[in-house]
Swiss-Prot record:
It comes from the Bacteria. Part of the 50S ribosomal subunit. It comes from Salmonella typhimurium (strain LT2 / SGSC1412 / ATCC 700720). GO terms for cellular component: cytosolic large ribosomal subunit. This is Large ribosomal subunit protein uL6. This protein binds to the 23S rRNA, and is important in its secondary structure. It is located near the subunit interface in the base of the L7/L12 stalk, and near the tRNA binding site of the peptidyltransferase center.
Length: 177
């Protein structure tokens, strides 16, 4: 049995936590995040820490409490430090540019690909083949990165495509005659 829920989430100075039933709102310098927790979870805010436990009558109380603890810990980190995700474009002529909140990609198609960024997410291109996504919500950043990667996933023979910066693409050997 995992004991994740037993550890409290420390709330640093400058972070405001509001608990309204099962709706938790966390506000910090990088923005405000809100999440509705499962009914099986009970959250208490005391001594600059959030503690978690199961409610009576729910069989999966501890499991849901561990999930809630991990989600709220990510929210606290997001509103204080923020999250970043880096993508690389590998391939001849593959380019990226950011105009406002739109990422423009040239990925070898007959048309450019424009991807609208959701609110709270910013993108920048240090080089034409790199994209850096920044924001407070870890889940949204991961989803945007997955959406950008899905336009041209790395292919297994040359590794061309959009990949995460820390991703290792397994390449196959070409067919022999």
């Amino acid at each position: 049995m995992s004991r994740v829920a037993k550890a409290p989430v420390v709330v640093p100075a400058g972070v405001d936590v509001k608990i309204n039933g099962q709706v938790i709102t966390i506000k910090g310098k990088n923005g405000e995040l809100t999440r509705t927790l499962n009914d099986a979870v009970e959250v208490k805010h005391a001594d600059n820490a959030l503690t978690f436990g199961p409610r009576d009558g729910y069989a999966d109380g501890w499991a849901q409490a561990g999930t809630a603890r991990a989600l709220l810990n990510s929210m606290v980190i997001g509103v204080t430090e923020g999250f970043t995700k880096k993508l690389q474009l590998v391939g001849v002529g593959y380019r990226a540019a950011v105009k406002g909140n739109v990422v423009n990609l040239s990925l070898g198609f007959s048309h450019p690909v424009d991807h609208q960024l959701p609110a709270g997410i910013t993108a920048e291109c240090p080089t034409q083949t790199e994209i850096v996504l920044k924001g407070a919500d870890k889940q949204v950043i991961g989803q945007v990165a997955a959406d950008l990667r899905a336009y041209r996933r790395p292919e297994p023979y040359k590794g061309k495509g959009v990949r995460y910066a820390d991703e290792v693409v397994r390449t196959k050997e070409a067919k022999k005659k």
